[in-house]
A protein has these predicted regions:
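Nuclease-adjacent, charged terminal/linker segments that flank catalytic cores
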Residues: 1-79
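Residues at alpha-helix caps and immediate loop-helix transition turns in enzyme cores, especially N-
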Residues: 16-17, 159, 187
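Short, well-structured alpha-helical interface segments that form or flank functional binding sites
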Residues: 32, 36, 115, 158, ...
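Surface-exposed alpha-helical segments enriched in charged/polar residues
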Residues: 39, 43, 161-168
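Solvent-exposed, charged helical/coil patches
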Residues: 67-115
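Ordered hydrophobic segments in well-structured contexts
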Residues: 89-91, 101-103, 119-123, 144-146, ...
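Conserved catalytic cores of phosphodiester-cleaving nucleases, focusing on short active-site segments
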Residues: 118-134, 138-159, 163
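Domain-level recognition of nuclease-like catalytic cores that cleave nucleotide substrates
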Residues: 164-169, 174, 178-228
Length: 228
């Protein structure tokens, strides 16, 4: 099975929803990888209590906020309020806690007042709705979790340097993650020395690495729940 086919199969298994016909094995690997990591975020939220039997909920909505079963993921960076991009986001609800939204590929405003791409963003739902209504870019401080996804077999130190710069500008509430399909001892050392959360070789067929990331995501959701 090809890498793209493996990613697509894993996405469908975890999300259990209909994918857009245009989103298949011919889709660029980077787009599939972001959708794959998105599916791990969703699974971590379910494991942490976003289930009806635990007083929570998980739904998927279109750009107008209507519940949908047809998942269409953003394939290029865009604004959370863009009416020209038909894309799906997830709504996560934990019992008695503020609702959250999960987006792929949205622009976020940092301390430098420059819009930066965030591969995967988890933010307060009321802030996300306000951003769409007011047609503004979310602030980094409105995000709970942010993830940088790298679908690269051979990582170089530039990737680590760029991530460190990105996290310095976009300071989120809870956790920043550097997640990659490949690995590099140099990148790992650089991120570890800078106390960044990093996960290498996160791919179907690498259950230990996948589970480690999901547990870290669950911990972030657990901390969010404790603080609210």
């Amino acid at each position: 099975m090809s890498i793209n086919a493996s990613l697509l199969q894993s996405i469908r298994l975890r999300l259990g929803r209909a994918m857009s016909p245009s989103f298949g094995t011919a889709t660029q690997g980077t787009d599939l990888y972001e959708a794959y990591i998105f599916s791990l975020v969703i699974r971590a939220a379910l494991n942490e209590g976003a289930l009806p039997e635990q007083g929570g909920a998980l739904t998927f909505c279109d750009r107008d906020g209507q519940i949908t079963t047809n998942l269409l993921f953003r394939r290029s960076p865009g604004q959370i309020y863009a009416a020209t991009q038909a894309c799906t986001h997830a709504v996560i609800e934990f019992k008695g806690k503020p609702s959250l939204e999960v987006h792929i590929g949205i622009k976020v405003m940092g301390r430098l007042k420059v819009a930066r791409e965030c591969d995967i963003a988890v933010l307060y739902r009321d802030r996300a709705i306000a951003c769409r209504t007011q047609r503004r870019i979310p602030k980094a401080s409105e995000l709970i979790i942010a993830i940088e996804c790298k679908h690269i077999e051979a990582l170089d130190l530039d990737a680590a340097s760029e991530f460190i710069g990105l996290t310095s500008d976009l300071r989120v509430k809870e956790s920043w993650f550097f997640v990659s399909s490949g690995s590099s001892e140099g990148v790992a050392r650089m991120l570890a020395n800078d106390r960044k959360e990093w996960h290498h070789n996160v791919m179907p067929g690498e259950p230990n690495n996948v589970n480690r990331l999901m547990y870290s995501l669950q911990s972030s959701f657990k901390n969010f729940k404790a603080k609210h």
